[in-house]
Amino acid sequence: ATSTQDPNERVIFQRMEEQTNVHIDWTCFVADQFADKKNLALAQFGNLPDGLFNAGMNDYDLLRYAKQGIIIPLENLIDKYMPNLQKVFEQYPEYRTMCTAPDGHIYSFPWIEQLGAGKEAIQAIGNIPYINKKWLDYLKLGVPSTVDELKETLIAFRDHAAELEEEFGIEGGVIPMSFIINNGDQDPSILINGFGEGYGDTGDHFAVTDQGEVIYTTVQEGYKEGIQWLHQLVEENLVDPEAFTQEWSTYVAKGKNHRYGLCFTWDISNIDNYQDYVMLPALAGPEGLVNITRQNNSETSGFDRGRCVLTTSCRNTALAAAWIDQMYAPLQSPQNNWGTYGEEDSFNIFEMGTNKGGEPMLRHMDLGDQSPVEVREAQSVNGPLAILNEYYDVYVTQPDDAKWRLDNMHEVYLKDMNSKYVYPNVFMSIEDTNKISQYDTD
């Protein structure tokens, strides 16, 4: 597949220009430079870009740049020029509410991806632990079901490293367990759900009791006990020494060399392969408690509030809004999110077919042994979009890897999702986001 960084060389945007007769002059920043480049671009008040397509803005950014007069309110543009996004808001009013700032304005166009709902949403768990079944079988071990059994299994991986390396041709050495700390889907927090009260931890450290009380996970006794247990694993050389510092590329490289006994990620095929790993079930804690704390915001599926913004330098806001609205068209959003079809000399994500009614429908191609993340990044453009549950088998088929993940999630974890509530996607004020930042630092 193509891997150009120039958006105008992406087939998706080339087709969009043909359809709309709108040419975009893009400035493209590579991912590891984006935050700094974005801040510099938005500091040039007299020479701002018209907008940011993949803005990557959190609540604090949106409110700060709005207060400074750098980004503009969008609600009137949405109501006048964006029928596709309006339809999404009408079908799911909670998304409009979630996009609305405390001052009543909407400052950004969102990214929305649904697959399943409630406890059965694919986003209910992000950081799935995958354990190496091939190693378990070779060592004649079962899949662990308690924290004590997991520790013994990791010890077995460590103590039989030489045998495993010889048997499976592992280069670089066996790593019993690896992760990327505080990195969303790559974080190991799911392992400590069985400690204490059973809240474990979430990416933003909020949880909701069955009585509807919002709590902060890191001050709970169960969290402290779980962290002490993880510390024991580190002390016994069961954890990758780079787990607290490594970046995604390093994490993946070691996985592709088949070095992991246990790792954490959204989809194991991005790290290693489906054949060698199984999902590690919810582990019973020291007192026998078994629980899966669902990912916050997952009741409303995948949602990124600050995906796309317009600035005060945008002179034709109506045209910009109408063009962005095309990203929310039901046949366009899946392509922006995953990739496209019909690109010559490329690994295409889709082929264009038809649904049962004979209307156009995007059909996912078989990815084979390819990493879903890598092949999709070569064609997709991301940005603002919406993929709703109602679109599947009407405008687009479900991705095979997502269906595999969802089916296995339901089989392994659904029965242990005991909590009634998750913390919703709240648009906080600047004052509240500052407080949360202080708590995280402390």
Regions found by a protein language model. Name each.
Residues 332-442:
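Conserved small-residue motifs centered on glycine
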Residues 23-29, 242, 278-280:
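General small-molecule cofactor/ligand-binding pocket signal
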Residues 278-376:
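Polar, glycine-rich mid-to-C-terminal structural blocks
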Residues 69-99, 154-158, 168-207, 254, ...:
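Carboxylate/His-rich catalytic cores and anion/metal-binding grooves
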